[in-house]
Amino acid sequence: MTLQMNTGAVRRFAKAMKFGAWLQSIPGKLMPAPFRLVQIGSAYWQSRALFVAARLDVATHLGEECLSAAELAGRLGASGDALGRLMRLLAAIGVFEETAPMVFRNNKLSHYLHSDDPHSVRAMILLHNSETMSRPWFEQLEAGIRSGTPPFLLAHGEELFDYLDHHADFDRLFS
């Protein structure tokens, strides 16, 4: 189907994206500016927690069950207390559901972290938070802004797509 034949769908998509952007702007309008800045500044913690849950493949191990943090930790080879804190953080931001104190299950959001789901975004979470992608942001972003050199190039000595050519495991994750 050509773009011209699909003009209606393109317009609907553009409207949906505009509506989504408007929805995302609501928190900034409803909360005091200092609180919103702190929220943005600490978003890394949420992203990192999500990354660890994806690395551990928590959603797949939970499946359709409700499991205590201790039971889940046993399946994952993790500390029950530490996993419980991680799961509570993720439940607080809506990624999993805490059905009773320290008992968790998947919800509509975490369903897309199942490694065997065809619509899973787990690989994308792993990619975005990988050391390869994190280093440019944490170690080279300021230098890149000052010099005009891409932070990825500063961190890895080559452009992203050249890097992909030389690192097959990362290329598979990227694809």
Where are these regions (language model features)?
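Conserved Class I S-adenosyl-L-methionine-dependent methyltransferase catalytic core
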Residues: 13-175
